[in-house]
Amino acid sequence: MEIDLNADLGEGCGSDEALLDLVTSANIACGWHAGGANAMRDCVRWAVQKGVSIGAHPSFHDPENFGRKEMQLPAGDIYAGVLYQLGALSAIAQAEGGRIAHVKPHGALYNQAARDPLIADAVVSAIHDFDPSLAVFGLANSVFVAAARHAGLAAVEEVFADRGYRADGSLVPRSQPGALIDDENAVLARTLDMVRERKVRAVSGEWVPLNAQTVCLHGDGPHALAFAKRIRTALEAAGVDVVAPGALQADEDA
């Protein structure tokens, strides 16, 4: 059994370089919700050095709210914004001897694309037109994953180790009770359930089936780094190989 571990980097948490020793995929902020040219370059350089798969982490242009405020924009604006951010990170990756392998939207853009077909199609179109070989990271069972596959893109279904789920498979909004799980032992158990059993317990009590292909580890918080290491260690102890999505695909094609 195999799984990818990913983390969102370049967002000013200060643990980026150390996190890259634990994850197999890095989603690098492209400057619109956090980060900037120097942070992007640092993260790309470290990822190249450590052999971690590089991904773009585009968002709405919303640094004031860390990209977490929902926006209703024309599809053309979303398309252009995603293209702009992909181009910036791709240029830096090329200069550092790497390349973008995947795209994972951030924050409100991620959540809206997960449920809104128009937003999902705008993001998917930008990715496809930029480079149809790129994989897409999206919420497991979401509209966004379906849109990516319909467009012929490789879609990697993502689960979250420390987030609450609703019965429909969506994440509990951060403004609501149960959105974040603080108990580390509970998070470890949930992660193993999602990876090995392909299911997660919703806040309402139901089991929700999902296809976990990559697990997001958060790097913010005083104990985040140590806890990320605990999750990786627990997965490996359970016989789960931690590998990047490209390796997963290669194994499936073999």
Curated annotation (Swiss-Prot):
Its EC number is 3.5.2.9. The keyword Ligase does not apply. It catalyses: 5-oxo-L-proline + ATP + 2 H2O = L-glutamate + ADP + phosphate + H(+). GO terms for molecular function: 5-oxoprolinase (ATP-hydrolyzing) activity; ATP binding. Coiled coil: none annotated. The keyword Repeat does not apply. Gene3D superfamilies: Glycoside hydrolase/deacetylase (3.20.20.370). Pfam families: LamB_YcsF. Keywords: ATP-binding, Hydrolase, Nucleotide-binding. GO terms for biological process: carbohydrate metabolic process. Catalyzes the cleavage of 5-oxoproline to form L-glutamate coupled to the hydrolysis of ATP to ADP and inorganic phosphate. Belongs to the LamB/PxpA family. Forms a complex composed of PxpA, PxpB and PxpC. HAMAP family: PxpA. This is 5-oxoprolinase subunit A.
